[in-house]
């Protein structure tokens, strides 16, 4: 047994050794010995258990060894026994030594733990400290997360510090040290709290004992010091002694701050010194009341008595708000009569007369002895005394009359603190009535309440004739001793106020002298009140003058004078007093030190000045290439993605060497790469070392990447001050220099903005090779250490023509290629050239350029079109035209090597390009910067953007360009100088004197737009709007609208003469003399219609494209002429047109005829002064010989098939695109007989067949029904005179604020200073107040999403549920016989968390911001975040949606469905239990409101504005709009009375043609008419789109006339509304369809050319099974030439919707193979689809036909024939009879089903 014992002993010894190296822990016994009042640091459980096991093993082994020793003593062998005992004794000694060491270690650990040292620990989160609280152990304190951010700066703010400290303790779950029953806390917790509050106090207020261990010592010390400093006179702790407030206080913010500090102080006093008082509320109320003057105290008590306490706010806050509101409401004194501060105690809360420090009058003192004299300015007429003297005099008079007894019955008391009027004399009351209720007032006249017996009205005399008397509501109180009039009510009703010293009561008309008796203001009753039987007049009392007096010399300090004079300049004040400009004799006392006004320094702080030459002095201290400044220019406005938008510039401060580079973006990687490249270039090529770089604080220069690079290179990066752009002025100026140089190069070369990067490179190179005026050296030579030689002739002119060698030329082919010079290639010895024929930019040094000094005719593309003086014959002209044409054809497909752009071949067909070629042969003159040449080789996105300054303009302050002008004054003058028509060509009457015009020199060519390109480029909106009545001349000069000049039309062209208007004879053949003769024939003066009713005085346009303007009894046709002066064509830029479009969208449609290319400009002056109204000019399509209109489609259907009408305004694009092409020019004459060449005759013949652009008003976005008006905080609360409404809004506001706190949208306790947060991360908020129709007051705090920075959001688009998805949901739920409920999710957006970092202003402290945690209303990403949050939640519980029906979710077993649109939900389940379980699950995560539930198997509710009735037992669903139609009936009741009732909503015929008929009305009438039409059609579109398919055709038909406010159009609309009101029960009816083989059936119809513009209309009705799904009537998207083509178009549209419905149903599990059945009544269409071959048709129709044929072959659809009479879709394309319309109503009611329709076909 000895061997095991020894082995075990060795193990014990080893265990003992390992136990010695364990961590410092304590046993459970040691912990139990610790006093309960002082907790220790806890030990990990596993270490305790291991340590306990080791101790137990030691004890067990020791006991075993001792037992073994006893057994050995009994052995016989003494020698063996001695040896064993010796060894065993040694082992026992070692074990005991180990145990002793362990015990010592335990004692040492216990001693250390008893010290309660606060140890620092570190984990993954950061540094923390462990301590125990009374409720928890091992609590961790992380200093970086638990921040106490309040810092006090004076002793008065200590209560606020303590209040915030209490919130801090509560928030982070420390022990509440403010509880009196706490004796001891953990010393480590005490140490943490001591550190925190010491940091809050700061060094200047450190009153804390650093060795203290009791937190109560800190609190008691703070209270004691605060009481001693702030409440010196409060020995008995009387509340409110240091503050006095009366009705003259106007600084509400300061008063609120003072009262809040008072409340906090009284709380601490109450907790320590007022424990006998059981109610804290009563104590605080008494404290606040103690601060109020007697004139204010009773009114506050009355308000507290009458207004209930808002439970949503604290009691002390309610008291403070009541005091402030009472002070604001009860002050009748005008602002100019209020003292800035009390003259005795300098307080701003009360006036001098109520001050407690006011001297005792009985002692004969007028002011305190210590008070310095206050001198007021006195006028020389001595009519006004100083306030002190006036007060003394008034007091003396009062003392002389002290023995006089006043009769209270003849006097009226003016109460400045009361809000009601009372009297004890019933005879003063008019219309007296006894009070039926027991009404009592508190605080009026007596200390107790008084009862009101009745009420009436007292008339106040308010003038000499007493005709304007005002009545005041007055209560009859017999208990009162006299009549009391409220000063507030008197001022409100009669504008009568008290004077400054209460000596006068009156207004501008009447003044009444007052009497002050025992501190109460009295006036004579007969001077103020008119008795019911007294009609005598009261004369106004004139004030008497005061005797004169002499002013003594006064002394005034500079500080006092500075404050009195409104903090103006000290030098001005000293000079004014020194030069005796004031009546007083003043001695100015100056302080020994320099005068310092902190208010002025803060309010008038300015940026430091940058003196001229300061940067030059800095640059001389650095060697060349060592100091650089850099900046970024951009973005350049361009719609092309392949155009670089930014330019980086670096300028050497010493040599002015400049380095530029252009980039697509300005992110950190791009800029860093370029800066690195530039620095390496300078160091390698110029052998210079870059040591410092100056830049602004843009994010591209202040990121970590570029800073790391600068540090690695040892470069000093100098940043400018915030918003101090002048500090980087050198880079700013060089940006302007380079950009203006590049703009000049682009302008002179007539190149597009895409070439701006090459122009910048060229400009930079040139500047580096020119001597700088400051240094006198070439920058390149100055910066380079090596000698540099420069040759001037090595520079090539930018944008000029040149010839380069073609190294790939073939034999017998020219070896030269025409090109355009760009700039030097920095990577080679050659130049960059643009080769139009190759569409490439290449580098070459094999070039040849012309000598421009010898021949000025061969210039760049701007001057390719030679003037007539250089052309000798037709051959030269044709050669020039051919050259320009070839160049244009090459430029139109330009493509850089590295930047592919859109090619015209990809945009247009060969036919369109051929028309472009024909137009390209007649380029613009050289002085037209927006000519056809640019249009030909420009892509669609940049068409018309030729104003280089406008495109290069940015928000950078260094570049300022005039966007409204194309040419500068200098350029404009040069343009005028180059004009070849003399001003003398226009006579005084504004007519063109053709005898002075040299027709050979005036050569302009006509430009037209290809008709096919018109449709493709214009899209669907061809509107050009002109506004600004004050600038008619500018407006008429526009190239887009013709050229009616000035503000009137005194002479107009009479186009009724056959010699001018004959269609068969070209106008170009007319002689100028004939034109002049026709102009002189017109003697009519044009006047425009005056204001009148909408839709009246309408004249129609005749077939000769004339405008008939009604002037009295005559109709005057008007023909507009084009300008011949280039000044008129160039002075009006497209930017102005865009500006005009934004200002007004509804100009009246007056047509401008531009079909004659030989017209000239005409200026006319209106003789009778009639101003020309704003014109809407449209071009009329040229009719053919047979009168048919062959112009292409130039407008798009304004109808919206699935939503209310919306507008896509493309008029700005049209203005830019065709601004230059609308210019008309004269043809060149070559012979004396004015005959045309054969070429021109052939050209004119072709032109006469071309169509022109039709400009009509675009469609404005419709307006929905008027919403409830929302108001803001000032109107709802701050300035709301209705106290009840204000109270309701306050409750709503606090409820909303509390709701945001409960939802944890933000944490008001964690706030940040605005200076710490970047401005782009702060989003301002607004509070919207509304009163709903049910009377509930609502407040909603929303973000200003319109001011959001792009840094605060990324993707904001989201998909949501639409109305068709709701209908699918209802049909499926009904077919599955499911239980349904509807509900709302309250404040839905607030459940979604924000991914971005956004801050909003703090709700209580606008100086701070709080971090936004949830998606608050108004943020751009809130809808997306909410949809994603809801989708994630529903997907997590097993409900999925799909791409076809976003917002519609269902489970895999299809037993639960939910459709969600924002916060409106409808839920369907297979059983009621599952439905309730799902709703309860939603309630656990969202706050819900059940809006509809099944009652007796019937669900009657509303969903998405529709009235829903679901009968589960019968299996029916009805959708109607009764509620909305009833509101329409009430709204338009008066208009509907004039409409005859009808059983159909549409008209029998539609004959209105807005393209031919012209409205004659004023602009304002037109605008108001269109606005009214948009509102009406918006409501009708809403009704139609929801569920009223019976008005589909009628609404879509009249919707095309939304911009035509004719009385017949209004009649059509009101007829539809009358029909809706009469048949409001019609809607959609669904029956339960249990058929498993449900089909998708569509019936279509079409009518060709039935619209006023020869467009076609199609109609489609769609069923799913036996229930109708969708109905729509649309105008065809393409022009159909036959009925068969229109029918094919309708079949395709019906099939497309059917296929979409089929796929959607498949995703929802409603059958995998739903057959599609198409029904039509067109036999030719069916035969055409069944043919094996197809005849050539229009491109788009052919594609659609082939798709249908392919589906028929695949048997995906079945095409059936129905008779024309049986086609129910016929009413969607044309007006039908009442019987046919009733048949369609039966379809909507599901009395005629799809199966009945199939029975009528060949199915």
From Swiss-Prot:
Q: Where is this region: Integrase-type zinc finger-like?
A: 540-600
- Its Enzyme Commission number? 3.4.23.-, 2.7.7.49, 2.7.7.7, 3.1.26.4
**GO:BP terms for this protein?**
DNA integration; DNA recombination; proteolysis; transposition; viral translational frameshifting
Q: Cite the binding residues for Mg(2+) 2.
A: 1384, 1463-1464
| Modifications after synthesis and translation | Proteolytically processed into capsid protein (CA), Ty4 protease (PR), integrase (IN) and reverse transcriptase/ribonuclease H (RT) proteins. Initially, virus-like particles (VLPs) are composed of the structural unprocessed proteins Gag and Gag-Pol, and also contain the host initiator methionine tRNA (tRNA(i)-Met) which serves as a primer for minus-strand DNA synthesis, and a dimer of genomic Ty RNA. Processing of the polyproteins occurs within the particle and proceeds by an ordered pathway, called maturation.
Coiled-coil region list:
39-115
Question: Which branch of life, at top level?
Answer: Eukaryota
CDD domains from the UniProt entry:
RNase_HI_RT_Ty1
Query: Which keywords, in A-to-Z order, does the entry hold?
Result: Aspartyl protease, ATP-binding, Coiled coil, Cytoplasm, DNA integration, DNA recombination, DNA-binding, DNA-directed DNA polymerase, Endonuclease, Hydrolase, Magnesium, Metal-binding, Multifunctional enzyme, Nuclease, Nucleotide-binding, Nucleotidyltransferase, Nucleus, Protease, RNA-binding, RNA-directed DNA polymerase, Transferase, Transposable element, Transposition, Viral release from host cell, Virion maturation, Zinc, Zinc-finger
Region (Disordered) residue spans: 1224-1250
Q: Where is this region: Ty4 protease?
A: 382-502
Q: What is its main location?
A: cytoplasm
Instruction: Provide the residue positions that the database annotates as binding Mg(2+) 3.
Output: 1645, 1687, 1721
GO CC, sorted alphabetically, is: mitochondrion; nucleus
- One GO MF term attached to the UniProt entry: RNA binding
Subcellular localization: Cytoplasm; Nucleus
Instruction: Name the SUPFAM superfamilies on file.
Output: DNA/RNA polymerases, Ribonuclease H-like
Q: Which residues bind Mg(2+) 1?
A: 631, 696
More details: Retrotransposons are mobile genetic entities that are able to replicate via an RNA intermediate and a reverse transcription step. In contrast to retroviruses, retrotransposons are non-infectious, lack an envelope and remain intracellular. Ty4 retrotransposons belong to the copia elements (pseudoviridae).
Q: Which PANTHER family match?
A: TRANSPOSASE, PUTATIVE-RELATED, TRANSPOSON TY4-P GAG-POL POLYPROTEIN
Record's domain comment? Integrase core domain contains the D-x(n)-D-x(35)-E motif, named for the phylogenetically conserved glutamic acid and aspartic acid residues and the invariant 35 amino acid spacing between the second and third acidic residues. Each acidic residue of the D,D(35)E motif is independently essential for the 3'-processing and strand transfer activities of purified integrase protein.
This protein's assembly is summarised as: The protease is a homodimer, whose active site consists of two apposed aspartic acid residues.
Q: Main role?
A: Capsid protein (CA) is the structural component of the virus-like particle (VLP), forming the shell that encapsulates the retrotransposons dimeric RNA genome. The aspartyl protease (PR) mediates the proteolytic cleavages of the Gag and Gag-Pol polyproteins after assembly of the VLP.
Protein name per Swiss-Prot or TrEMBL:
Transposon Ty4-J Gag-Pol polyprotein
Task: State the species of origin.
Answer: Saccharomyces cerevisiae (strain ATCC 204508 / S288c) (Baker's yeast)
Q: Kindly list the organism's lineage.
A: Eukaryota, Fungi, Dikarya, Ascomycota, Saccharomycotina
């Amino acid at each position: 047994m000895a061997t095991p014992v020894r082995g075990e002993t060795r193990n014990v010894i080893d265990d003992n050794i390992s136990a010695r190296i364990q961590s410092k822990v304590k046993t459970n016994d040691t912990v139990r010995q610790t006093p309960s009042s002082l907790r220790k640091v806890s030990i990990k459980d596993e270490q305790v258990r291991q340590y306990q096991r080791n101790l137990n093993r030691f004890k067990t082994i020791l006991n075993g060894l001792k037992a073994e020793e006893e057994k050995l003593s009994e052995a016989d062998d003494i020698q063996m026994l001695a040896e064993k005992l010796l060894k065993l004794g040694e082992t026992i000694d070692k074990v005991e030594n180990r145990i002793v060491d362990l015990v010592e270690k335990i004692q040492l650990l216990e001693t250390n733990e008893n010290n309660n040292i606060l140890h620092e620990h570190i984990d993954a989160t950061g540094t923390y400290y462990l301590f125990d609280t009374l409720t928890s152990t091992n609590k961790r304190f992380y200093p970086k997360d638990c921040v106490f951010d309040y810092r006090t700066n004076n002793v008065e703010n200590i209560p606020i510090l303590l209040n915030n400290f209490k919130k801090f303790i509560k928030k982070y779950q420390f022990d509440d040290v403010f509880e009196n029953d706490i004796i001891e806390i953990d010393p480590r917790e005490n140490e943490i709290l001591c550190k925190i509050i010491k940091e809050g106090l700061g060094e200047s207020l450190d009153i804390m004992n650093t060795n203290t261990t009791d937190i109560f010592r800190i609190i008691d010390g703070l209270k004691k010091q605060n009481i001693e400093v702030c409440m010196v006179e409060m020995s008995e702790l009387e509340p409110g002694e240091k503050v006095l407030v009366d009705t003259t206080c106007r600084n509400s913010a300061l008063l609120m701050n003072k009262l809040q500090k008072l409340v906090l102080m009284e709380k601490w006093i109450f907790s320590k010194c007022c424990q006998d008082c059981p109610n804290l509320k009563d104590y605080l109320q008494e404290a606040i009341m103690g601060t109020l003057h007697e004139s204010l105290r009773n009114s506050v008590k009355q308000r507290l008595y009458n207004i209930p306490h808002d439970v949503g706010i604290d009691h002390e806050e309610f008291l403070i708000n009541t005091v402030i509101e009472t002070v604001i409401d009860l002050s009748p004194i005008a602002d100019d009569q209020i003292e800035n501060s009390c003259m005795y105690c300098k307080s701003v809360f009360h006036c001098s007369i109520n001050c407690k420090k006011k001297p005792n009058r009985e002692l004969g003192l007028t002011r305190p002895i210590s008070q310095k004299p206050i001198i007021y300015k006195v006028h020389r007429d001595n009519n006004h005394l100083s306030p002190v003297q006036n007060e003394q005099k008034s007091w003396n008079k009062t003392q002389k009359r002290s023995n006089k007894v006043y009769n209270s019955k003849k006097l009226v008391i003016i109460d400045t603190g009361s809000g009601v009027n009372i009297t004890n004399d019933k005879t003063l009351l008019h219309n007296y009535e006894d009070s039926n209720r027991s009404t009592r007032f508190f605080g009026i006249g007596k200390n107790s309440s008084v009862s009101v017996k009745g009420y009436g009205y007292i008339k106040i005399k308010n003038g000499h004739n007493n005709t304007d008397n005002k009545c005041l509501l007055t209560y009859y109180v017999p208990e009162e001793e006299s009549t009391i009039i409220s000063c507030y009510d008197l001022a409100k009703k009669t504008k009568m106020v008290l004077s400054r010293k209460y000596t006068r009561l009156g207004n501008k008309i009447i003044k009444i002298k007052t009497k002050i008796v025992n501190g109460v203001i009295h006036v004579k009753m007969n001077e103020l009140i008119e008795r019911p039987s007294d009609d005598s007049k009261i004369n106004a009392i004139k004030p008497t003058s005061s005797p004169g007096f002499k002013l003594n010399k006064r002394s005034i300090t500079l500080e006092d004078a500075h404050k009195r004079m409104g903090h103006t300049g000290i030098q001005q004040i000293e000079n004014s007093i020194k030069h005796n400009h004031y009546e007083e004799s003043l001695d100015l006392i100056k302080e020994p030190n320099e005068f310092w006004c902190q208010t002025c320094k803060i309010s008038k702080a300015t940026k430091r000045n940058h003196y001229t030459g300061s940067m030059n002095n800095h640059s001389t201290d650095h060697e060349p290439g060592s100091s650089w400044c850099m900046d970024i220019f951009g973005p350049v406005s361009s719609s092309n993605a392949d155009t670089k938008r930014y330019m980086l510039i670096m300028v050497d401060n010493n040599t002015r060497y400049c380095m530029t580079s252009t980039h697509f973006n300005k992110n950190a990687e791009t800029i860093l790469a370029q800066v690195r490249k530039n620095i390496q270039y300078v160091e390698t090529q110029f052998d210079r070392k870059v040591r410092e770089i100056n830049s602004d604080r843009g994010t591209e220069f202040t990121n970590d990447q570029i800073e790391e690079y600068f540090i690695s290179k040892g470069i000093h990066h100098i940043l400018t001050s915030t918003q101090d752009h002048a500090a980087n002025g050198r880079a700013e100026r060089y940006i302007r220099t380079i950009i203006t140089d590049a703009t000049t190069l682009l302008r002179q070369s007539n190149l597009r903005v895409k070439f701006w990067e090459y122009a910048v490179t060229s400009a930079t190179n040139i500047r580096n090779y020119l001597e700088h005026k400051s240094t006198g050296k070439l920058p390149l030579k100055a910066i380079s250490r090596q000698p540099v030689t420069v040759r001037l002739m090595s520079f090539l002119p930018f944008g000029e023509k040149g010839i380069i060698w073609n190294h790939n030329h073939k034999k017998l082919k020219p070896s030269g290629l025409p090109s355009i010079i760009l700039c030097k290639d920095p990577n080679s010895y050659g130049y960059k050239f643009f080769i139009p024929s190759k569409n490439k930019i290449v580098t070459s040094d094999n070039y040849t350029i012309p000598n421009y000094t010898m021949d000025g005719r061969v210039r760049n593309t701007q001057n390719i079109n030679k003037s007539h003086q250089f052309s000798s014959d037709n051959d030269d002209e044709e050669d020039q035209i051919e050259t320009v044409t070839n160049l244009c054809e090459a430029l139109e497909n330009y493509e850089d090597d590295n930047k592919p752009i859109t090619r015209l071949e990809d945009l247009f067909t060969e036919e369109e390009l051929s028309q472009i070629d024909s137009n390209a042969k007649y380029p613009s003159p050289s002085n037209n910067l927006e000519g056809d040449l640019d249009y030909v080789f420009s892509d669609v996105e940049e068409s018309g953007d030729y104003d280089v300054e406008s495109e290069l303009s940015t928000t950078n302050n260094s570049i300022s360009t005039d966007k409204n002008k194309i040419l500068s004054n200098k350029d404009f003058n040069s343009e005028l100088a180059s004009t070849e028509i003399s001003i003398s060509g226009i006579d005084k009457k504004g007519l063109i004197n053709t005898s002075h015009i040299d027709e050979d020199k005036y050569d302009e060519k006509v430009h037209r737009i290809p008709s096919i390109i018109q449709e493709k480029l214009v899209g669907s909106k061809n509107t050009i709007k002109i506004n600004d009545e004050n600038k008619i001349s500018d407006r008429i000069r526009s190239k887009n609208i013709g050229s009616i000049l000035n503000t009137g039309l005194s002479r107009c062209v009479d186009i009724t003469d056959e010699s001018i208007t004959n269609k068969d004879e070209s106008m170009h053949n007319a002689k100028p003399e004939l034109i002049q003769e026709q102009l002189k024939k017109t003697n009519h003066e044009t006047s425009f219609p005056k204001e009148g009713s909408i839709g009246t005085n309408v004249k129609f346009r005749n077939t000769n494209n004339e405008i008939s303007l009604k002037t009295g009894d005559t109709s005057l046709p008007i023909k507009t002429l084009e300008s011949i002066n280039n000044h008129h064509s160039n002075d009006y830029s497209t930017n102005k047109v865009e500006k005009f479009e934004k200002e007004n969208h509804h100009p009246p449609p007056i047509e401008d005829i531009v079909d004659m290319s030989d017209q000239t400009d005409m200026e006319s002056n209106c003789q009778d002064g009639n101003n020309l109204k704003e014109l809407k000019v449209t071009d009329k399509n040229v009719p053919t010989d047979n009168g048919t209109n062959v112009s292409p489609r130039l407008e798009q259907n304004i109808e919206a098939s699935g939503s209310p009408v919306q507008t896509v305004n493309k008029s700005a694009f049209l203005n830019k695109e065709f601004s230059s092409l609308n210019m008309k020019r004269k043809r060149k004459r070559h012979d004396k007989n004015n005959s045309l060449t054969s070429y021109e005759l052939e050209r004119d013949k072709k032109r006469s067949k071309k169509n022109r652009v039709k400009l009509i008003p675009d469609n404005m976005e419709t307006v929905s029904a008027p919403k409830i008006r929302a108001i803001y905080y000032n109107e709802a609360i701050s300035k709301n005179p209705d106290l009840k409404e204000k109270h309701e809004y306050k409750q709503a506001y606090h409820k909303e604020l509390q709701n945001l706190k409960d939802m944890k949208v933000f944490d008001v306790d964690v706030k940040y200073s605005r200076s710490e947060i970047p401005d782009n991360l702060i989003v301002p908020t607004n509070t919207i107040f509304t009163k709903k129709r049910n009377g509930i007051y609502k407040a909603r705090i929303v973000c200003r999403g319109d001011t959001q920075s792009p840094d605060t959001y990324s993707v904001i688009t989201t998909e949501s549920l639409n109305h068709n998805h709701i209908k699918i949901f209802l049909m499926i739920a009904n077919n599955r016989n499911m239980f349904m409920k509807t509900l709302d999710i309250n404040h839905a957006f607030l459940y979604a968390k924000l991914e971005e970092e956004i801050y909003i202003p703090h709700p209580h402290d606008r100086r701070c911001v709080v971090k936004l945690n949830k998606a608050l209303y108004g943020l751009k990403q809130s809808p997306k975040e909410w949809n994603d949050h809801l989708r994630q939640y529903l997907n997590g519980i097993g409900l999925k949606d799909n791409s076809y029906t976003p917002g519609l979710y269902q489970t895999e077993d299809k037993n639960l469905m939910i459709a969600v649109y924002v916060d409106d939900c409808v839920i369907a389940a297979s059983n009621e239990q599952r439905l309730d379980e799902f709703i309860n699950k939603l309630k656990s995560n969202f706050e819900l409101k059940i809006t509809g539930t099944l009652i007796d198997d019937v669900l009657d509710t509303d969903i998405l504005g529709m009235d829903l009735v679901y009968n589960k037992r019968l299996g029916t669903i009805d959708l109607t709009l009764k509620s909305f139609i009833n509101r329409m009936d009430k709204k338009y009741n008066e208009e509907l009375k004039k409409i005859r009732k009808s059983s159909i909503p549409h008209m029998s015929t539609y004959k209105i043609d807005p393209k031919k008929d012209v409205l004659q009305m004023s602009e304002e009438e037109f605008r108001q008419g269109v606005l009214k039409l948009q509102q009406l059609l918006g409501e009708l579109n809403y009704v139609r789109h929801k569920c009223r398919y019976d008005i589909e055709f009628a609404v879509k038909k009249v919707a095309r006339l939304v911009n035509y406010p004719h009385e017949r159009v209004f009649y059509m609309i009101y007829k539809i509304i009358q029909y809706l009101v009469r048949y409001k029960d019609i809607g959609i009816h669904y029956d339960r369809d249990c058929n498993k083989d449900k089909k998708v059936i569509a019936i279509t119809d079409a009518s060709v050319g039935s619209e006023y513009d020869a467009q076609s209309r199609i109609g489609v009705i769609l069923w799913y099974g036996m229930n109708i799904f969708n109905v729509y009537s649309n105008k065809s998207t393409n022009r159909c030439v036959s009925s068969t083509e229109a029918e094919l178009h309708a079949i395709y549209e019906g099939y497309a919707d059917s296929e979409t419905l089929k796929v959607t149903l498949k995703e929802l599990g409603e059958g995998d193979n739903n057959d599609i059945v198409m029904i039509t009544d067109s036999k030719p269409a069916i035969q055409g689809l069944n043919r094996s071959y197809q005849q050539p048709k229009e491109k788009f129709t052919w594609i659609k036909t082939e798709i249908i044929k392919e589906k028929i072959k695949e048997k995906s659809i079945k095409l059936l024939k129905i008779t024309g009479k049986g086609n129910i879709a016929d009413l969607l394309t044309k007006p039908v009879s009442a019987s046919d319309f009733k048949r369609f109503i039966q379809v909507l009611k599901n009395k005629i089903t799809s199966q009945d329709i199939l029975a009528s076909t060949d199915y």
